[in-house]
């Protein structure tokens, strides 16, 4: 089975162009399933799999405390894997027939109000090169709605500041062009002129925009650590994740009259239904404003 999994992962890289993080997620999910099957029965041929094996695996995952979201992801990964095997002639039947994906409550994105955004964007120590970098990253995230992976993957050639935009490669290797406002442009230019040259190291000749203190490109994990420090410094009590500024970017655009299709394009969503979740957020926020300020609310 491990050889078949490797073939599948290679297919996802070459034919589907999926990101390294997505490939790792598939790999973890499939090996988790195989480790379960190794205990229940020796699995050398996928054609011996039955629906009962999948049902048993789902029950096992729940017993181990896996969330409905995780179980749903396992099922999606297995479904894709088995479809690949059947299409490739390595599997004659689909054991996923009549397997339902666990229902999961869809939580609304956590969004900052404008005051909290201002606190977050002004909480970096801009007297240091690292502080200038951190401020620039926060400004870019809120100004563009980039995913964190897209942010840390930015190269110098992706910046077109004289024209007021940046370009990025998002999910599915889709390129998109995103406008950059004056404030974010000014902060980014200051970082590029005053801080980035001090962070560069001769032995690392890379062109990533955002560098760590070793002169290497910043990682997602590195950014998460930075964000936790900034969030603590800001004094904001709400939980803040790497996606918080992206959620706030989308919600504030819609609140100020942007149309849904434009926001979808800026976020890089393949399906507009993904973007529509933010309309629910704006409705709830309007309801809160009404309750707070209407004399008869």
Swiss-Prot record:
Keywords: Cell cycle, Cell division, Chromosome partition, Cytoplasm, DNA integration, DNA recombination, DNA-binding
Record domain Tyr recombinase: where: 107-291
The encoding gene: xerD
Places the protein is found: Cytoplasm
GO molecular function per UniProt: DNA binding; tyrosine-based site-specific recombinase activity
Annotated Pfam families: Phage_int_SAM_1, Phage_integrase
Location of the Core-binding (CB) domain: 1-86
Family statement drawn from the similarity comment of this UniProt entry: Belongs to the 'phage' integrase family. XerD subfamily.
Protein name: Tyrosine recombinase XerD
The keyword Cell division is annotated on this UniProt entry: yes
Protein role: Site-specific tyrosine recombinase, which acts by catalyzing the cutting and rejoining of the recombining DNA molecules. The XerC-XerD complex is essential to convert dimers of the bacterial chromosome into monomers to permit their segregation at cell division. It also contributes to the segregational stability of plasmids.
GO aspect biological process, one term: DNA transposition
Active-site residues per Swiss-Prot or TrEMBL entry: 147, 171, 243, 246, 269, 278 (o-(3'-phospho-dna)-tyrosine intermediate)
Subunit description: Forms a cyclic heterotetrameric complex composed of two molecules of XerC and two molecules of XerD.
GO terms under cellular component: cytoplasm; Holliday junction resolvase complex
Species name: Listeria monocytogenes serovar 1/2a (strain ATCC BAA-679 / EGD-e)
Entry-linked HAMAP family: Recomb_XerC_XerD, Recomb_XerD
